Amino acid sequence: MKIKSIRKAVLLLALLTSTSFAAGKNVNVEFRKGHSSAQYSGEIKGYDYDTYTFYAKKGQKVHVSISNEGADTYLFGPGIDDSVDLSRYSPELDSHGQYSLPASGKYELRVLQTRNDARKNKTKKYNVDIQIK
């Protein structure tokens, strides 16, 4: 009985501490009528990351460009086992810098720093352009 209580306490502690490191802004991406892209700006510090969520359909292509080379972009969503690196030279992208979405549903784009810069608690400003075709 005591072991179950300890396991629950450890799990709760892990959940609470993991979310505290992920402070940042959450944005629901809105594409204006007749437009397939949206632009946002932000600032990340240390291990924080900003999250941009959007809905897309299987087979659509997403292209992300970011103004700060020191910021990384990763995509999470249906049909993606872990995450997909959407940075400029990622092998996941086609020759046009686009990633073909594997399933329909809600996707989450995270903008974060490299581990080295996060450890140094650096702050980075960025502009991001998200396109869905």
From Swiss-Prot:
Keywords from the named record: Periplasm, Signal
Localization terms from the record: Periplasm
GO cellular component terms, A-Z: outer membrane-bounded periplasmic space
Location (main, coarse): periplasm
GO molecular function ontology, one term from the record: lysozyme inhibitor activity
InterPro entries: Peptidase_C_arc/bac
N-terminal signal peptide: 1-22
Superkingdom assignment: Bacteria
Any single biological process term in GO: defense response
Pfam annotation, one family: PPC
Function in brief: Inhibits activity of g-type lysozyme, which confers increased lysozyme tolerance to the bacterium.
Protein name: Inhibitor of g-type lysozyme
Species name: Escherichia coli (strain K12)
This protein's encoding gene: pliG
